[in-house]
Amino acid sequence: MSDQEAKPSTEDLGDKKEGEYIKLKVIGQDSSEIHFKVKMTTHLKKLKESYCQRQGVPMNSLRFLFEGQRIADNHTPKELGMEEEDVIEVYHEQTGGHSTV
């Protein structure tokens, strides 16, 4: 297991209150865990990009879920009500699935 920090975006740099960072666990389909320390106001796109880069896969090939809801690039931990040690689940995107009648 390793810790990696998703760097805050430039609009987040002005707000440096204590306790603004939380640790999140990202768990893949293979049960692998990667821990991230993120600011409550950072867009989760940064975490998603960092995870995909570490896994060596394109971002559009995965979907990220928190409490069963898909995470949009512009969501923040604060908007989603995330807390310390919350879990983000990662699944491979599936396309197709039409019936052949």
UniProtKB/Swiss-Prot annotation:
GO biological process terms held by the UniProt record: cellular response to cadmium ion; cellular response to heat; negative regulation of action potential; negative regulation of delayed rectifier potassium channel activity; protein sumoylation; roof of mouth development
Positions of crosslink type Glycyl lysine isopeptide (Lys-Gly) (interchain with G-Cter in SUMO2): K7, K16, K17, K23, K37, K39, K45, K46
Q: Where is this site: Interaction with PIAS2?
A: F36
Q: What is the lineage of its organism?
A: Eukaryota, Metazoa, Chordata, Craniata, Vertebrata
Q: What protein am I looking at?
A: Small ubiquitin-related modifier 1
Q: Which Pfam families match?
A: Rad60-SLD
**Gene label:** SUMO1
Give GO terms: molecular function aspect only.
Answer: potassium channel regulator activity; transcription factor binding; ubiquitin protein ligase binding
Chief subcellular location: nucleus
Q: Does the keyword Isomerase apply?
A: no
The cross-link described as Glycyl lysine isopeptide (Gly-Lys) (interchain with K-? in acceptor proteins) comes at G97
